[in-house]
């Protein structure tokens, strides 16, 4: 286990102990290990190394896995991984669909080292559907690059500004999300709930989530980037990401600055040092890294030093290390590194000893090179000794059998000779068996100030090389006769070489065939063979001994070749030419090549040999790499402009490009889904705007001549140019990755004529089969999807003759030879969609209609012949003269069944209708209005009507006059014989007493003899009189005596009040729901009139809640309700209201005061009016009208006097607020007039302090401004059913047989009764599919306001269902 980027692959074994020490002190902050950076590619084997990692100190790259499948990742999860210190890169990992299970707890990416300025890179992940990093809270440094992921969604739902400090440099393009094809649905959205936090980006208030099941965690703004707990409490300022407890530096998930001994700190205190920008280490830790790396022979690790309170890999520029304390000290002027040889001379006998002089520029002393073996010696010696410029003493090369050349001293230019070897030698070379070259004297200068040269027993070093050194170094004439041995230097080398000449050279893209002239020494048996040397040489400046040593390290590739067979025929004059076929070469690459002989050595005669000059040969061209950066855009409805850049590896001279294109069919899912339903986002497709460049202006010149002459593109700024350079560098890096994979070029195709492109004409798309449907839609033929091809000699192409608003798949190949056997690259793919046709979505012809009985109108129209993509729905707009315009959504499937739409339940009158289609490109034009007249299906012939209409008009006028007189007298005598007028909380519950005050109550089976009722004690004052607790005999079957509540009427009550009292009791005779207070009987004979009700032992809910306050005087000793108890209350009230809703009753006055609490604490809907006098302050008289509970009323009820089940749902939300606040006054601090204005302007209550999030979400659902967006009471129960008491299913309406609706549930109503009924403005076109009746003119009110979801894509607003951003109340 290594630490630090520099040691991630080379010093791993050295640092296991250090890592173990760190893990031992990690505490609970990091439960696993600190692992080095990882590069995981090709397969999943190394991925298991992440199993125990909490921190990756370095980067994590997962890439190039082409055989993996989704099931391979299903059991892989690394929940311990919390932080990556550098960057995370994913590239071409097949089968990986989400990271939510792979890295479920990844919280921080620090970005200490970036990948081209990016800390998170997701590139060409072909199967990735979502990121899923739902615990990712901070990317401390760097940006995000997410590019070319064709299936990746849930990008628009991520608020990156909550994760990064700046989002300006993020590069998120060419993903599926860009095309608006993603139906991103955050948790709860499909069920109408708002579970995820919403934030504002670019003026849009959007929910934030990572997946359909994981919200993005958004901490309060005050927490900044410190993170917060699950409850939303801010973490300590030193935390990063999240924490388990607030304001505690030991409970952080990760540290903002540095980690030390189980807690987060701002800086490392002495004696600790900063390490890798995230943790603190002591001096011993840094020292161990330094010496273990220095003693290691493995390259790449760093000898860590101390600088500015940091443990860093090496001293910065301008500093040098003090070896005594590992501190970096500044240089004076340029920073030479003078190395003092303490004993006067230093022997270099290994790479390790050479590393001690790494970075030295001046040697104060002498060097002795005595290296007999080692790996990669030439490179290692050059890395460690290559900076030496000056030696003050002497240089001695002795018995260094591994050396071939001294070129590793590449900067040595001065040997002072202040200290000389015995015999006054400043350069000494003895017994170096393989030394063949000193330096390349054409490029190297060396001065020896004093002293002589000594050369003995260097058998392969020619004397000519030694004499050249004498001339260059200025030592010629200093040497004596025995200083340079004439017989032991060069005696085994071919110093008197003949020149070999190549006689034949032939090349291919990966081979070179060579032949050269034959060579034979005087004794042909001395020739052992030939040695062929070659290497890549971009430039023709190569020398023979570059990078060579005698231990095998050699920058040249060497091939041993046997000598040719020598003919035994002495007359033969044509000896065969030796040669070699070089294989495995790179195409279109220049190679340096030379050949020399290998001969035996003889003491008895001179050694002969031969060697060629270095020649340069280039291999042939072959298939190029893929073209770079293909971009496709559309500039019209029939054209696509394609641009690209040349391939990075042309492997020859690019001669032309091949472009193939093929029309793509639309997703089959689009044909099947009903986009009028709730939760389905309307699909759309987009096309890219044309290029804003000179070329594109040329393409569009005929179409945009005026604009082109007036506008020109602005010059790019330096920052834009820098950005493009960075992006280009990024793309080239990934091109290197592509070369790790062997691509197979496309099989050659038969060329097609370009004229065939003209046959790609606009056609309609295929419609899936619907039963009993006669469709005029023409199926798309296979011929129309055939591919087309064009040869292009430049780096752009305009493809014409395409179908409007249609997707095309385009393949692009680069070729570097124009011949029958083309050399072309693997294809680069790009997709594009043509622009829409302006009138293609317009409906052809007029809208026709047919009127049936029962006020049913069948509308019919023709589908657009060639729409933009395909039609997904139709919008029908109709209105009756004098009324508002109504809109109806007709799905594609519904239109296919009906060839139009049926309007049902229309009121008599003149109507106008118009229709428009919505395609993938948007809305078409409205048709011309069609007019029709709907008559009353009860109309009689006109001659009879004339006889009837006259008397009716007379009766109507007479009624108006009588009514006016009656109202006048009432105003003059408000306390007349009828008594004062009380506003009923539920006018629907009244009989005709308001219209016929003389009506009389008729006793029925509910009548109870007065003698069976015994009054015990007073319970409280009701709206009509006192309410008592009593006993009733034989009132419930099987019970001899029952405790009951008895309501009475005051003796002074008027006749109207007594009738209203009995009629309210009559209404309750029809209620048999466990969660509605039950009527047990009526005593109407005699005085006073009694109504016997089920006894609710704990009174009304408002009083009960207030009694549970800890400081309440009447507290019965019970604690405040728990969350479970509040959910139980909520469900019981919702179940009772659902029952009333099913009975077609609107409550109008739902509040805690009108809910009652039974002896077992079951909450039930109260007896509709009992509490009016008791809580009179909760009501408000508006404009001289009746008393109104304005603090519980919905906006539409306050504004228009409209009361529906949806307005009851608003009141239900206020009841939830009362439950969670223990019955505080809603909008406390605001007057009734202020509340009325506040609510009508879109305001609603803030949740109470410490309100459970689940109940807060329910409240906000109830307080949607648009009534149609509020849930139903049945939906509320359905949301809570899993958390209710086991007895709930046995007694509730929700689980009862009565809740199972019949096939059609409609209600006959008079037109005058429609005022208080929630009308379905969408008509019944869609309802017909659900089994509604076709006949009859009755008006259905069965939850149409909930089931028909408004289509928010059509000019949203309050009237069609957009959820608006509402102002929040601030009662305080």
Curated annotation (Swiss-Prot):
EC number: 2.7.10.1
Ligand binding (ATP): 1023, 1047, 1094-1100, 1153-1154, 1167
Mod. after translation: After being transported from the endoplasmic reticulum to the Golgi apparatus, the single glycosylated precursor is further glycosylated and then cleaved, followed by its transport to the plasma membrane. Autophosphorylated on tyrosine residues in response to insulin. Phosphorylation of Tyr-989 is required for IRS1-, SHC1-, and STAT5B-binding. Dephosphorylated by PTPRE on Tyr-989, Tyr-1175, Tyr-1179 and Tyr-1180 residues. May also be phosphorylated at Tyr-1175 and Tyr-1180 by mTORC2. Dephosphorylated by PTPRF and PTPN1. Dephosphorylated by PTPN2 and Ptprv; down-regulates insulin-induced signaling.
Sugar-bearing residue positions: 43, 52, 105, 138, 242, 282, 322, 364, 424, 445, 541, 635, 653, 700, 759, 772, 910, 923
Extracellular topological segments: 28-748, 753-946
Keywords: ATP-binding, Carbohydrate metabolism, Cell membrane, Cleavage on pair of basic residues, Disulfide bond, Endosome, Glycoprotein, Isopeptide bond, Kinase, Lysosome, Membrane, Nucleotide-binding, Phosphoprotein, Receptor, Repeat, S-nitrosylation, Signal, Transferase, Transmembrane, Transmembrane helix, Tyrosine-protein kinase, Ubl conjugation
Main enzyme class: transferase
Record membrane topology: Single-pass type I membrane protein
BP GO terms, sorted: adrenal gland development; animal organ morphogenesis; cellular response to growth factor stimulus; epidermis development; exocrine pancreas development; G protein-coupled receptor signaling pathway; glucose homeostasis; heart morphogenesis
Keyword Transferase among record annotations: yes
Boundaries of every Protein kinase domain copy: 1013-1288
InterPro entries per the UniProt record, alphabetical: FN3_dom (IPR003961), FN3_sf (IPR036116), Furin-like_Cys-rich_dom (IPR006211), Furin_repeat (IPR006212), Growth_fac_rcpt_cys_sf (IPR009030), Ig-like_fold (IPR013783), Insulin_TMD (IPR040969), Kinase-like_dom_sf (IPR011009)
Residues covered by region (PIK3R1 binding): 1351-1354
Pfam families: fn3 (PF00041), Furin-like (PF00757), Insulin_TMD (PF17870), PK_Tyr_Ser-Thr (PF07714), Recep_L_domain (PF01030)
One cellular component term from this protein's GO annotations in UniProt: caveola
Site (Insulin-binding): residue numbering on this chain: 66
Insulin-binding: annotated span: 735-743
Function summary: Receptor tyrosine kinase which mediates the pleiotropic actions of insulin. Binding of insulin leads to phosphorylation of several intracellular substrates, including, insulin receptor substrates (IRS1, 2, 3, 4), SHC, GAB1, CBL and other signaling intermediates. Each of these phosphorylated proteins serve as docking proteins for other signaling proteins that contain Src-homology-2 domains (SH2 domain) that specifically recognize different phosphotyrosine residues, including the p85 regulatory subunit of PI3K and SHP2.
Record-given protein name: Insulin receptor
Gene coding for it: Insr
């Amino acid at each position: 286990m290594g630490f630090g980027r520099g040691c991630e692959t080379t010093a791993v074994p050295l640092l296991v102990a250090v890592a173990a020490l760190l893990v031992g002190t990690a505490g609970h902050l990091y439960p696993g290990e600190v692992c080095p950076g990882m590069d995981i590619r090709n397969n999943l084997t190394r991925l298991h190394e992440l199993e125990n990692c909490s921190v990756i100190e370095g980067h994590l790259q997962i890439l190039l896995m082409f055989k993996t499948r989704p099931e391979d990742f299903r059991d892989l999860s690394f929940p311990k991984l919390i932080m990556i210190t550098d960057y995370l890169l994913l590239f071409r990992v097949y089968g990986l669909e989400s990271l939510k299970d792979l890295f479920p707890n990844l919280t921080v990416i620090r970005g200490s080292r970036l990948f081209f300025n990016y800390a998170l890179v997701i590139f060409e992940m072909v199967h990735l559907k979502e990121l899923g990093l739902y615990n990712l809270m901070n990317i401390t440094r760097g940006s995000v690059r997410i590019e070319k992921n064709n299936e990746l969604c849930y990008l628009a739902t991520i608020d990156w500004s909550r994760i990064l400090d700046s989002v300006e440099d993020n590069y998120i393009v060419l993903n599926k999300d860009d095309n608006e094809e993603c139906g991103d649905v955050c948790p709860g959205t499909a069920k109408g709930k708002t579970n995820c936090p919403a934030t504002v980006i670019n003026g849009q208030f959007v929910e934030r989530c990572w997946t359909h099941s994981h919200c993005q965690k958004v901490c309060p703004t005050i927490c900044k980037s410190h993170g917060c707990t699950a409850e939303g409490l801010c973490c300590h300022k030193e935390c990063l990401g999240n924490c388990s407890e607030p304001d505690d530096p030991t409970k952080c998930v990760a540290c903002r600055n540095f980690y030390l001994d189980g807690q987060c700190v701002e800086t490392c205190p002495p004696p600790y040092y900063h390490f890798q920008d995230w943790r603190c280490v002591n001096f011993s830790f840094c020292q161990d890294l330094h010496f273990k790396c220095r003693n290691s022979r493995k390259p790449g690790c760093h000898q860590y030093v101390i600088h500015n309170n940091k443990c860093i890999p090496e001293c910065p520029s301008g500093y040098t290390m003090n070896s005594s304390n590992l501190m970096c000290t500044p240089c004076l002027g340029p920073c030479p590194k003078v190395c003092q040889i303490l004993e006067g001379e230093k022997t270099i006998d290994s790479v390790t000893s050479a590393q001690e002089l790494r970075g030295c520029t001046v040697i104060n002393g002498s060097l002795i090179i005595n290296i007999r073996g080692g790996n990669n010696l030439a490179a290692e010696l050059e890395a460690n000794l290559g900076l030496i410029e000056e030696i003050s003493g002497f240089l001695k090369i002795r018995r260094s059998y591994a050396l071939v050349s001294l070129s590793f001293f590449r900067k040595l230019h001065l040997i002072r000779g202040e200290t000389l070897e015995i015999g006054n030698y400043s350069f000494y070379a003895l017994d170096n068996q393989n030394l063949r070259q000193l330096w390349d004297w054409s490029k190297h200068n060396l001065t020896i100030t004093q002293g002589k040269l000594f050369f003995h027993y260097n058998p392969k070093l020619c004397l000519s090389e030694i004499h050249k050194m004498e001339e260059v170094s200025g030592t010629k004439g200093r040497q004596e006769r025995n200083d340079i041995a004439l017989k032991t230097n060069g005696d085994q080398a071919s110093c008197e070489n003949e020149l070999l000449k190549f006689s034949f050279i032939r090349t291919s893209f990966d081979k070179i065939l060579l032949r050269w002239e034959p060579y034979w020494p005087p004794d042909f048996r001395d020739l052992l063979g030939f040695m062929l040397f070659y290497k890549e040489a971009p430039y023709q400046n190569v020398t023979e001994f570059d990078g060579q040593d005698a231990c095998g390290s050699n920058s040249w590739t060497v091939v041993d070749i046997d000598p040719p067979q020598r003919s035994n025929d002495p007359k033969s004059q044509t000896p065969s030419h030796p040669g070699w076929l070089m294989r495995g070469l790179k195409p279109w690459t220049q190679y340096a090549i030379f050949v020399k002989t290998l001969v035996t050595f003889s003491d008895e005669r001179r050694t002969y040999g031969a060697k060629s000059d270095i020649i340069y040969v280039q291999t042939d061209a072959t298939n190029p790499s893929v073209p770079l950066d293909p971009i496709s855009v559309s500039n019209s409805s029939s054209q696509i402009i394609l641009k690209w850049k040349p391939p990075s590896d042309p492997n020859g001279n690019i001669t032309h490009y091949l472009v193939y294109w093929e029309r793509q069919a639309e997703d089959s899912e689009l044909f099947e889904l009903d986009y009028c339903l709730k939760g389905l986002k309307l699909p759309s497709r987009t096309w890219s705007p044309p290029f804003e460049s000179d070329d594109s202006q040329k393409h569009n010149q005929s179409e945009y001549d005026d604009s082109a002459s007036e506008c020109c593109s602005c010059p790019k700024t330096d920052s834009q140019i820098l950005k493009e350079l960075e992006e280009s560098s990024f793309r080239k890096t990934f091109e290197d990755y592509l070369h790790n994979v062997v691509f197979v070029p496309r099989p050659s195709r038969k060329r097609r004529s370009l004229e065939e492109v003209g046959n790609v004409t606009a056609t309609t798309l295929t419609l899936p089969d619907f039963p009993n449907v006669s469709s005029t839609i023409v199926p798309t033929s296979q011929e129309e999807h055939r591919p087309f091809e064009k040869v292009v000699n430049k780096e752009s192409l305009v493809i014409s003759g395409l179908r409007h608003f249609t997707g095309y798949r385009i393949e692009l190949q680069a070729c570097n030879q124009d011949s029958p056997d083309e050399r072309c690259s693997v294809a680069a793919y790009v997709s594009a969609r043509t622009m829409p046709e302006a009138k293609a979505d317009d409906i052809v012809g007029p809208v026709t209609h047919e009127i049936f009985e029962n006020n049913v109108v069948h509308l019919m129209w023709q589908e657009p012949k060639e729409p933009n993509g395909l039609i997904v729905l139709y919008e029908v707009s109709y209105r009756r003269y004098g009324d508002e315009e109504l809109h109806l959504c007709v799905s594609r499937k519904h239109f296919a069944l009906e060839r139009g739409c049926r309007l049902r339940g229309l009121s008599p009158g003149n109507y106008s209708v118009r229709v428009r289609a919505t395609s993938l490109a948007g809305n078409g034009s409205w048709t011309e209005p069609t007019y029709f007249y709907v008559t009353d299906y009860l109309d009689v012939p006109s001659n009879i009507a004339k006889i009837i209409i006259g008397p009716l008009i007379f009766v109507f006028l007479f009624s108006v006059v009588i009514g006016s007189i009656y109202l006048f007298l009432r105003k003059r005598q408000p306390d007349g014989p009828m008594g004062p007028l009380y506003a009923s909380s539920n006018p629907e519950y009244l009989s005709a007493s308001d219209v016929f005050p003389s009506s009389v109550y008729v006793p029925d089976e509910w009548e109870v003899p007065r003698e069976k009722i015994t009054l015990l004690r007073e319970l409280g004052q009701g709206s009509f009189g006192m309410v008592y607790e009593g006993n009733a005999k034989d009132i419930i079957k099987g019970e001899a005596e029952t405790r009951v509540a008895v309501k009475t009427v005051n003796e002074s009550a008027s006749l109207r009040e007594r009738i209203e009292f009995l009629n309210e009791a009559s209404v309750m005779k029809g209620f048999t729901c466990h969660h509605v207070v039950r009527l047990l009987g009526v005593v109407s004979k005699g005085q006073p009139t009694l109504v016997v009700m089920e006894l609710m032992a704990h009174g009304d809910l408002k009083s009960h809640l207030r009694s549970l306050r800890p400081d309440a005087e009447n507290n019965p000793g019970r604690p405040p309700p728990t969350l479970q108890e509040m959910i139980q209350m909520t469900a019981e009230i919702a179940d009772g209201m659902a029952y009333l809703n099913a009975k077609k009753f609107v409550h109008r006055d739902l509040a805690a005061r009108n809910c009652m609490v039974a002896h077992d604490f079951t909450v039930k809907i109260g007896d509709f009016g009992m509490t009016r006098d008791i809580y009179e302050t909760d009501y408000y008289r508006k404009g001289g009208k009746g008393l109104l509970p304005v603090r519980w009323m919905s906006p539409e009820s306050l504004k228009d006097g409209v009361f529906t089940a949806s307005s009851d749902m608003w009141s239900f939300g206020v009841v939830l607020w009362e439950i969670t606040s223990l019955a505080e006054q809603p909008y406390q601090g605001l007057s009734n007039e202020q509340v009325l204005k506040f609510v009508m302007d879109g305001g609603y209550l803030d949740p109470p302090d410490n309100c459970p999030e689940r109940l807060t979400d329910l409240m906000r659902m109830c307080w949607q401004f648009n009534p149609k967006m509020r849930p139903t009471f049945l939906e509320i129960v359905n949301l809570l059913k899993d958390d209710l008491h086991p007895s709930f299913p046995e007694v509730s309406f929700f689980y009862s047989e009565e809740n199972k609706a019949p096939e059609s549930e409609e209600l006959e109503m008079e037109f005058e009764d429609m005022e208080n009924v929630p009308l379905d403005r969408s008509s019944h076109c869609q309802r017909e599919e659900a089994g509604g009746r076709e006949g009859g003119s009755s008006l259905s009110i069965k939850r149409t306001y909930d089931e028909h979801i408004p289509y928010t894509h059509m000019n949203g607003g309050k009237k069609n269902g957009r959820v608006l951003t509402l102002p929040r109340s601030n009662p305080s």
